[in-house]
Amino acid sequence: MFQGMIDQVAGEIEHGDGHWRDAVSSMAHSAHDVLRRHPWVPPIWNDHFPGPNRFGHLEWILRTFSDGGFPDELVYHAYHAVEFHIMGFAIQEQQYAQSGMGDDMSEAEIYEMLGKTLPEAEYPHLWTHVRQHMDGDERDEFAFVLDLLLDGLENLRDAG
């Protein structure tokens, strides 16, 4: 039953066309949005044999990198890098939401809770990081890392 449900969710991922980088970026953002709508999927994505939608998704990614001029060995690594970014980010978002520091806590409550175990004088860099989380947009973080990944893959491809 889960296999079919996961495959149905995989079918919601939109696969763009055009230049490889734009297409992969568009697909990754679509997949991220889909997984946010179905937070139960990322932890069990690989627990079940893929169905036709997941196989189609895999084929699309491999073909897009291949058509983008990537050699087979780099296609292999590019696929895993992008998929791990999408899934890893989705799982981390889900776990953060379940940590007790979700949207239902005020910023003051989060600072108070952290202040009890993490004195700012001892952990100044961690506190800077926490404030960036509080003020930032997680969607921007997903895009930032995805762009780094795609830049690196493109550089590897071009270096031959």
Regions found by a protein language model. Give the residues of each.
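Generic alpha-helical structural context detector
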Residues: 3, 33, 80-87, 128, ...
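Amphipathic alpha-helical interaction segments
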Residues: 26, 56, 60, 77-84, ...
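Short, basic, alpha-helical segments at the C-terminal edge of helix-turn-helix-like DNA-binding modules
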Residues: 2-10
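Secondary-structure boundary elements
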Residues: 34-38, 63, 67-71, 155
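C-terminal peripheral helix-coil segments that are non-catalytic and often amphipathic
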Residues: 95-160
